[in-house]
């Protein structure tokens, strides 16, 4: 019922109509990938495209370049993608899902590794509209569902590889989330997951009081040992740490494409190793988990 309501709201959104009008122009487009997702159209619709992109702020993940328009997103998402790039051979000719896919930046980047099928899940109308704008020009076969991780067990299609990046700390029941991911996998399937974590040898998790790095919906920030235990309790048998990285102001920063604060405002001004609340500053661990 909820997804039907979201889909109806999405289809009735005035920006969806504008994007469909743009799509109907069937603009010739050269689609290429480097750190940015690049779209070259040489079209007369530049003013319309600019207007839609401005209405779709904030742009969190990217960047994107449409002709001479550079969407300098809050996150330089290629940094995260490049951490995972050495493992992308696993998606070749596989059925792949991106859970919490935002505007689809990572999925566009995955295309160069030739997945057989690529589906994004995110229950955000604004992020879906951003995706639809980019894909109206790029014309890729990527699919996008206005669904969340909790919808995976009853989705009807299983996946060989699932990406779930920057989601688990937003969930009040992380083990249930991991079970939902497992339920969405084919036999021998794998999940690539990242989460913020705390430096501690013990099997514990930080439970922030009200906010963590000024973010209100952070429930648990685990140690790596605690994360491993969560995965085992959810039924995963393989757990491999791929990388760790501290989030810095090169990777996440305020730009003209967001109308809010960013990382520099979320850290202790006297000690960048702490959040403004006094917790460890954000850092991420990237893991590969399998059944």
Swiss-Prot record:
Name the job this protein performs: Catalyzes carboxymethyl transfer from carboxy-S-adenosyl-L-methionine (Cx-SAM) to 5-hydroxyuridine (ho5U) to form 5-carboxymethoxyuridine (cmo5U) at position 34 in tRNAs.
Q: Which keywords fit this entry according to its UniProt record?
A: Transferase, tRNA processing
Keyword hit for Isomerase: no
Name the InterPro entries on file. Answer: CmoB, Mo5U34_MeTrfas-like, SAM-dependent_MTases_sf
> Does the keyword NAD belong to this entry?
no
PANTHER family named in the record? TRANS-ACONITATE 2-METHYLTRANSFERASE-RELATED
Q: Which domain of life is it from?
A: Bacteria
The portions of this protein that span the membrane are: none
The molecular function terms in GO held by this entry are:
transferase activity, transferring alkyl or aryl (other than methyl) groups
An annotated GO BP: tRNA wobble uridine modification
Top EC group: transferase
Residues reported to bind carboxy-S-adenosyl-L-methionine: 61, 75, 80, 100, 122-124, 149-150, 169, 284
Q: Note the subunit structure.
A: Homotetramer.
The record's catalysed reaction(s) read: carboxy-S-adenosyl-L-methionine + 5-hydroxyuridine(34) in tRNA = 5-carboxymethoxyuridine(34) in tRNA + S-adenosyl-L-homocysteine + H(+)
State the EC number(s): 2.5.1.-
Write out the similarity annotation.
Answer: Belongs to the class I-like SAM-binding methyltransferase superfamily. CmoB family.
Q: Report the protein name in the record.
A: tRNA U34 carboxymethyltransferase
